[in-house]
A protein has these predicted regions:
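Structural signature of beta-strand start/N-cap positions in the alpha/beta core
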Residues: 17, 39, 76-78
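Short conserved loop adjoining the S-adenosyl-L-methionine
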Residues: 68-74
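A short SAM/SAH-binding and catalytic strip from SAM-dependent methyltransferases
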Residues: 79-91
Length: 197
């Protein structure tokens, strides 16, 4: 199991409804159904992933979150999850607002562009980094709006979006991020997981 999925599962209560936006092959939904007995639905843009989810018995619809989330009623899910997809949207602010409208809470995870290995790659090699969490070259990446944990933390503050908890992940550990340790955790976390709303 991916460490990120475990950290997300630790936040999600049992027996609730979850919309997984950009659900990919449905691995996270499958985990949450098994471990948390959730009622899950997915929204995925790639047809091959939608077919894979459906073949696994998962409830998934094909669509683009930027154009389809408006069709979901307000507060229609207990949680809405957006796992490592925020940076791929043309208008991430609109998507975040829709997540928080559709769900009572949202979990958003991001690859952290402030991670020390990313910074080092830019500093010493002078080129866009390729890592496990940022696996594409600059010319074939779906990422449009790279940000750091600190950027998203500050964005939420500026837009009055309530942050319930922020978790940082790296190779060896999972740790909570607060204002008091934000600078250090922004440097040493590969992934940031935000529980919002």
């Amino acid at each position: 199991m991916k460490k990120e999925f475990k950290a997300i599962a630790d936040i999600i209560p049992k027996n609730i409804s979850v919309l997984d936006v950009g659900c990919g092959d449905g691995s996270l939904m499958n985990l949450l159904i098994k471990e948390k007995n959730i009622k899950a639905r997915g929204l995925e843009i790639k047809e091959e992933y939608v077919k894979k989810c459906i073949s696994r018995g998962l409830s998934v619809i094909e669509g683009d979150a930027e154009t389809e989330l408006h069709q979901f009623p307000d507060q229609s899910f207990d949680f809405v999850i957006l796992s490592q997809t925020l940076q791929a949207f043309y208008n991430p602010e609109k998507v975040l607002k829709d997540l928080l409208r559709v769900g009572k809470s949202a979990i958003v995870s991001i690859p952290n562009f402030g991670y020390w290995k990313v910074r080092t790659s830019l500093l010493f090699f002078g080129k866009m980094p390729v890592t496990k969490t940022l696996p594409n070259n600059w010319y074939d990446t779906p990422n449009l709006h790279m940000c750091t944990i600190k950027d998203l933390f500050n964005f939420c503050s500026d837009k009055n979006i309530k942050i319930n908890k922020v978790i940082g992940l790296n190779e060896n550990r999972t740790s909570e991020i607060k204002k008091s340790n934000l600078e250090r955790k922004n440097l040493f976390s590969k992934i940031g997981i935000f529980w919002l709303g």
